[in-house]
Amino acid sequence: MKKRRAHLAEQATHGFTRRSFIKGAAALTATGALVGCSPQTQNLEKAEPQKGAPETQIFSGACRSQCGQGCYLDVHVRDGQVVRTTAGHFEDGPEFDRICPKGLSQPARVYSSERLQYPMRRVGERGAGEFERITWDEAISEITDKWKQYIDEFGPTSIAFFLGSGNTAELGGGAPEGSVMARLLNVMGASRVLPDRDIATPMSWTYMFGPGSAGNRASDVPNADHHVIWGGDTAVSDKQRTHFYLEARDAGSELVVIDIAYRTMASKADWFVPVHPATDGALALGVVREILEQSWEATDFLRDHTEAPFLIKEDGMFLRMSDLGVEPTTTTNAQGQEEKVDPCVVWDEEAGEAVAHSEAKKPAMGDVPEIAGHAVKTEMEMIREAVAPWTLEHTSEVTGVSADDIKHLAHLYTQEGNVQTDMKFGLNHYNNGIYSSKCVNTLLLVAGQMGKPGSGLYTGEPNFGEGNVQACLQLPSTTGEVPQGVGAIINWSDFFNVVSSGQKLGEPFPVKAFYASCTNIVSNQTEQNETIELMKALEFIVIQDMTMNDTSLYADILLPACHWFETEDLRVRYYGNPYLLWNQKAIEPLYESKPDFEIYKLLAEGMGYGDFFQFTADEYLNTCLSTPFGKENGITIDKVREKNYLRCDTEPAVAFEGGIFKTASKRAMFYREAPKPDYNMGQEVDLEKEKFSCYWEPAREADLGNPIREQFPFTICCEHMRTRTHTQWYDVDYMKEFEAQPVCRINPEDAAELGIEEGDEIRLYNDRGSVTLLAVLNAGQQRKSLHCPRSFLTREHIDGDLARTTFNDYNQACRNQSYFDCAVAIEKL
């Protein structure tokens, strides 16, 4: 592997390598050839230290956007101004000392011309961006007077909160479930609008492995013989993790990338497997079939650590001991509630009889006789039946992956040592994302690549998490009152219908006011034209943010939140490292901006709920930290402040080590007998699709075989950008030197057929909307597949917006926005 990689590198550089450059540079320096670099000190005056230079202070900081990395920053301040940022240092984890261009350019965000400087009131047409300056007293008074009026007339659920993820900190953030904004919502009894993003893939892990972290820690990376990055470009979207893979590759492991385009991480891989968009689940099923065909499945692991031996009756329910005449018992769960205990049955080959699964010596996974009058099948039999149609030929036809590559993947996952899989959210962003993710999970289980060092998934570095959410939300007032709780849940896909119709599930449900913080929903949610209509239909909108982004333009009242470096806070929601991070206040808030924490408390006071917010920042943070892990380890905010970071290894290095999962049976699950949708909008649901992990169906629009592709032949991947997190950093001008404007990467053969050349303006369109951008010819693109960086504001596009081409409908049972499941046609302008 090493020789092959070195040979390819030599070819790519025509023999000119970093080592040869260094040797050549050394030789040239020795002969004086590098004149501009050689020492010439004879004519230089001795430099004297600058007198009276301002002292540089370094403060602890954290990058708090929702890229998920949670990078630790040193914030350099001189004369009360932020002058630079550098990577912070973890004494007990230097492998996480990382900073990216976004972290390095934070000072430009602090001093951005786009900063909201003072509270403002809309004076023009909504969306036109015409505002007048008002005072904080006026802003809080107008907001709370309106809210009280709506509550008196329509009830507290007429006010809807959207908790954004643009500031993932406990005091000022929206997204952390126990944030102060979430507490304000609970105290008021308002409605909560769920963003419904990035749900499908994590939900697949919960369904099959149980709740909580499902991935191995970074320390386990060196134990893998192969690393498979499936459905993403970690070099852009997961910078904290990427260097571990590259170091492991350099140490001898194989790096495999399965993706829909040849991107940065694919260029670093030993083996790149291109797959048609949204067909990853089909590929996994084809690989499973080949494994079973070759009898390579991990029989002992499947028998002992999964529910593969469990028996399913013809009615789709588990065969349980009660079916054999054994009365169920009861037990008390962790919440103090009584639960019925009726164990699932397996056929014990040693005993030659049906027994409770926990009592079996050797559970059967093949044919099982009729038991107590019930015809049954093992889950393993069902897996074999489900993958039978996925022959090498059929799988290759659907996915575009060659039969040889499918066979190679089957061999790699079962015959070539430990395989660790990093399943990225590329799979998540399609309407069939939940099914594709479960199919890949099934592959890992059938191959036995779970629960041991060097195997399993990467799902984010296990860490402290979001803290004691319930304690934060249910903290009584100073008079002993308890918060009302969330008044109602509204899914994003249903929000426009609820607002425009005044009904929810056929019942009256007026929503009049909308409050969003730390978010840019107009740019970041799907089907932008509908979002704009929603914003116009609402009576009263309050937006709290740092900048004049696309959503700010639609506000009735704008509240200026200060930058992260202008206040103190605790970074809690992140996936890139195992640390709690303390963000010190480095400078005073600029202009009239205020910390989000302070704004939430002002709104609470104005609403008459001040008694619920009579706590200091430290008191609230200590409540957040009072989890069982926090209590056991004596974690307080003062302890975090000792070094401004605190390592929290809340999970073992290897998830499910020894094959012990977090499900009720302690086994990994392939089947759920009574699944339920995770949202309710009155939709029709075929629950048969949701029961079994081997169910797969094509994507709604991205699938090549969909008839819609005759009218709209291209699909768009709206990918992450290096220089932005969602739309944050849009206001950093020198980042635009790297990604200056919206572009569309298109395969040169597709471009030639349409008469498109590099730099041409092209219009992507469908029945929902359109966007105009510049064409970039890229041979790394598959035919009929486009890639467009997705973090530009609407006003940065030539015309339209990528978000206008997407749809806002969910999978029947999974509340997940499908950013990539989008078909368009192309017009050259």
Ranges and model annotations:
Residues 118, 122-138, 296-403, 586-671, ...:
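N-terminal leader/propeptide and maturation segments of large enzyme subunits in energy/redox metabolism
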Residues 264, 549-582:
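Flexible glycine/proline-rich, aromatic-decorated loop/lid segments
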Residues 596-640, 727-745, 749-829:
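Long, contiguous, secondary-structure-rich segments that constitute the structural scaffold
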Residues 2-300, 304-364, 375-376, 393, ...:
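N-terminal export/assembly segments and adjacent metallocofactor-ligating motifs
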